Design a protein with these regions (language model features):
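Preference for long, well-ordered alpha-helical segments
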Residues: 146, 150-190
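Leu/Val/Ala/Ile-rich N-terminal alpha-helices, chiefly Sec-type signal peptides and the beginnings
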Residues: 1-72, 76
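Amphipathic, non-membrane alpha-helical segments in soluble helical-bundle scaffolds
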Residues: 13, 17-20, 43-47, 51-55, ...
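Charged linear interaction tracts used for macromolecular binding and regulation
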Residues: 59-160
């Protein structure tokens, strides 16, 4: 037997039932179904994914540094009390590159978020600004994922050569540029 409630039309925006439902949703201070709120939540989610990729790249470099140290930097002995300076420099180079990646990760995690200013929403065109932020976030995630993929392919037995470091720095520069563009977009909202 069919349910008679299935045949009823949904209430329109002029309906009292509709207004009560909207008031209940907004009465808690946040409406999950509005596009701007979804875009704000997506912004945080996307930046956390980009940060995970950067953290994975830095962790891989720290792992490679440990393997390199175990292989080439033996414990001191009477014959060799000091480590080989060339291998020591190469091991420190892993750490320096990982530190540069983590600096970008820190900037990404600490980046400004789009405010929820109810007074100026209509005057600023907030939805368009959130869409522009979404495009910047896509660039951030893609760049971070490419960087993590590049670092994942590094061999474990050798240091970072100049060509690979230049590619890593190129990805870091792209991420820095995307973070700067993101900051410029959000500066409009302040």
């Amino acid at each position: 037997m069919p349910d008679p409630a299935d045949d009823r039309p949904l209430p329109g925006e002029d309906s009292r039932l509709y207004r009560i439902g909207v008031m209940l949703l907004n009465g808690y201070g946040y409406n999950w179904y509005r596009w701007d709120n979804q875009m704000r939540a997506d912004d945080l989610l996307v930046r956390s994914r980009a940060s995970e990729h950067l953290e994975n790249a830095a962790a891989r470099l720290r792992d490679l540094e440990g393997r390199y140290r175990r292989k080439y930097l033996t414990p001191p002995s009477r014959e060799h009390p000091d480590p080989d300076p060339e291998h020591l420099t190469a091991a420190q180079h892993f750490r320096a590159v990982a530190q540069r990646i983590l600096e970008i990760d820190t900037r990404l995690r600490g980046a400004a978020v789009p405010p929820d200013d109810k007074i100026w929403v209509r005057q600023r065109g907030e939805l368009e600004i959130l869409q522009r932020l979404g495009k910047c976030d896509v660039v951030l995630v893609a760049g971070a994922k490419e960087l993590a993929g590049l670092v994942a392919q590094l061999p474990a037995d050798v240091g970072i050569d100049q060509a690979i470091e230049q590619r890593i720095d190129q990805h870091l520069d792209e991420l820095t540029g995307a973070l700067s563009r993101r900051g410029e977009i959000l500066a409009v909202l302040r």
